[in-house]
Amino acid sequence: MATLIYVDKENEEPGTLVATTDGLKLGSGPSIKALDGRSQVSISCFGKTFDAPTSLPKATRKALGTVNRATEKSVKTNGPLKQKQPSFSAKKMTEKTVKAKNSVPASDDAYPEIEKLFPFNPLGFESFDLPEEHQIAHLPLSGVPLMILDEERELEKLFQLGPPSPLKMPSPPWKSNLLQSPLSILLTLDVELPPVCSDIDI
């Protein structure tokens, strides 16, 4: 494969030799060709050769040549518009910066900026923590449902009752006794339905 290296004013002075280490190891000397004020170094290697055209404009040497050309044109078209804008004095600029600083609201240091994306406040949720005066670690609370109390009076009444126990809890009325017969269980489940209308054809 032949490697073409262009030496330009960006890298070195024109006319200087540039040789790769592979060429020195192989012992093959590079051949130099002068094209339009640029020196071209080609090293012969085995395989296919890819030769670049001799006269390349500077824009095509970039990786994104067509994109660069389009942006250069847009910059040229936008250039006169930017020059028409009036120049502001230093006093006006300082006044604008002071106004901008005053208009910015104070940021919350409690939450990082990413948490401002959420529409809710995490502190607004209900907290089920008890005050430190009431200790419930010694109470057997396994199997006790969570009870939400609205007022402090009901909370005081709850603590006056003592520790809750599953044995003292009244059984719900829908719960049937295992010793009852199946017929009595079915009688408890009977529900009166409205009378059927025979006039309506289905």
UniProtKB/Swiss-Prot annotation:
InterPro entries (UniProt xref): Securin_separation_inhibitor
Cellular localization per UniProt: Cytoplasm; Nucleus
The primary location reported for this protein is cytoplasm
Task: State a single Pfam family of this protein.
Answer: Securin
Which keywords label this protein?
Cytoplasm, Nucleus, Proto-oncogene, SH3-binding
Q: Give the Gene Ontology MF terms in alphabetical order.
A: SH3 domain binding
Motif SH3-binding: positions? 163-173
Q: Where is this motif: D-box?
A: 61-64
Please tell me whether the keyword Cytoplasm is annotated for this protein: yes
- GO biological process, alphabetically ordered: chromosome organization; homologous chromosome segregation
Indicate yes or no for the key word Cytoplasm: yes
Q: Which GO terms describe its cellular component?
A: cytoplasm; nucleus
Comment text on domains: The N-terminal destruction box (D-box) acts as a recognition signal for degradation via the ubiquitin-proteasome pathway.
Family membership, please give it: Belongs to the securin family.
Which protein is depicted? Putative pituitary tumor-transforming gene 3 protein
Gene it is expressed from: PTTG3
